């Protein structure tokens, strides 16, 4: 299932999941501050789950 998720991210975003591991303030481990853009906000919302 993780491979399918990677394929979905690549198809929609045009980049693999590794790109987002250190993206913005909230994509990847931890997070603090204000989300930098819509993608970072999505990671922020996910972190709040």
UniProtKB/Swiss-Prot annotation:
Entry keywords, A to Z: Calcium, Disulfide bond, Hemostasis impairing toxin, Hydrolase, Lipid degradation, Lipid metabolism, Metal-binding, Myotoxin, Platelet aggregation inhibiting toxin, Secreted, Toxin
Keyword presence, Electron transport: no
Quaternary state and interactors: Monomer.
EC number(s) from the headed UniProt entry: 3.1.1.4
Active-site residues, as the UniProt record annotates them: 46
GO MF: calcium ion binding; calcium-dependent phospholipase A2 activity; phospholipid binding; toxin activity
One biological process term in Gene Ontology: arachidonate secretion
Pfam families, per the entry: Phospholip_A2_1
Classification via PROSITE patterns: PA2_HIS
Positions annotated to bind Ca(2+): 26, 28, 30, 47
SMART domains named among the record's database cross-references: PA2c
GO cellular component: extracellular region
Signal peptide per UniProt: none
Disulfide bond annotation, renumbered to this chain: 27-43
Protein name: Phospholipase A2 2
InterPro entries the record matches: PLipase_A2 (IPR001211), PLipase_A2_dom (IPR016090), PLipase_A2_dom_sf (IPR036444), PLipase_A2_His_AS (IPR033113)
């Amino acid at each position: 299932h993780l491979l399918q998720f990677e394929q979905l991210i690549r198809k929609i975003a045009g980049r693999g999941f590794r790109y987002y591991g250190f993206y913005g303030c909230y994509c990847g481990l931890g997070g603090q501050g204000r989300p930098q853009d819509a993608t970072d906000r999505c990671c922020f919302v996910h972190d709040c789950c």
